[in-house]
Amino acid sequence: MVEKVPMTQGGFVKLQEELRFRQQEERPRIIEAIAEARAHGDLSENAEYHAAKEAQSHNEGRITELEDLTARAEVIDLSKMSGSKIKFGATVKLIDEDSDEEKTYQIVGDQEADVKAGRISISSPIARALIGKEVGDSIEVNAPGGAKGYEILAVQWG
């Protein structure tokens, strides 16, 4: 059975845009660079040719990965999400029980995660600790610097 990859609509659109860019813009540019480098003669010591071939390999690998991800995508409609329990797509406001620092995170798919933008992967330790919890609950997360405790202040959808 094919394993579905949960993601938001925004994350799915970004993957589609990257796939289109790599297939329709990057691929032709690299093919042109290979042809140009090939025209310079001896391929054994042609750094431009080898760099272009390496770029082609990287680009084609990413295209294959993106095609697989978009085919297996399970787009979750956040506008239809509700409830008090935390699950995929929830935006959660937490307070660090040690420093009283407030943090807000949205739980998203692995491909969409960007901690600096407040989006954490559903498979991250903090998201796994949050799933199924509600406002007022406390969680403990084993972080690289030791265990950290958080209290859940709010859960929002959409």
UniProtKB/Swiss-Prot annotation:
What is this protein identified as?
Transcription elongation factor GreA
| Gene name in the database record | greA
Signal peptide (from-to): none
Q: Which organism is it from?
A: Agrobacterium fabrum (strain C58 / ATCC 33970)
Under Pfam families, the record lists: GreA_GreB, GreA_GreB_N
Q: Which PANTHER family match?
A: TRANSCRIPTION ELONGATION FACTOR GREA
Key words of the record: DNA-binding, Transcription, Transcription regulation
The chain's coiled-coil residues are none
The organism's superkingdom is given as Bacteria
Q: Does the keyword Transcription regulation apply?
A: yes
Q: Which PROSITE patterns match?
A: GREAB_1 (PS00829), GREAB_2 (PS00830)
UniProt GO MF annotations: DNA binding; RNA polymerase binding
Tell me which SUPFAM superfamilies the record gives: FKBP-like (SSF54534), GreA transcript cleavage protein, N-terminal domain (SSF46557)
Instruction: Summarize the protein's role.
Output: Necessary for efficient RNA polymerase transcription elongation past template-encoded arresting sites. The arresting sites in DNA have the property of trapping a certain fraction of elongating RNA polymerases that pass through, resulting in locked ternary complexes. Cleavage of the nascent transcript by cleavage factors such as GreA or GreB allows the resumption of elongation from the new 3'terminus. GreA releases sequences of 2 to 3 nucleotides.
Kindly indicate whether the keyword Transcription regulation belongs to this entry: yes
What is any one GO biological process for this UniProt entry? Answer: regulation of DNA-templated transcription elongation
Q: Entry's InterPro entries?
A: GreA/GreB_C_sf, TF_GreA/GreB_CS, Tscrpt_elong_fac_GreA, Tscrpt_elong_fac_GreA/B, Tscrpt_elong_fac_GreA/B_C, Tscrpt_elong_fac_GreA/B_fam, Tscrpt_elong_fac_GreA/B_N, Tscrpt_elong_fac_GreA/B_N_sf
Q: Which family is this protein grouped under? A: Belongs to the GreA/GreB family.
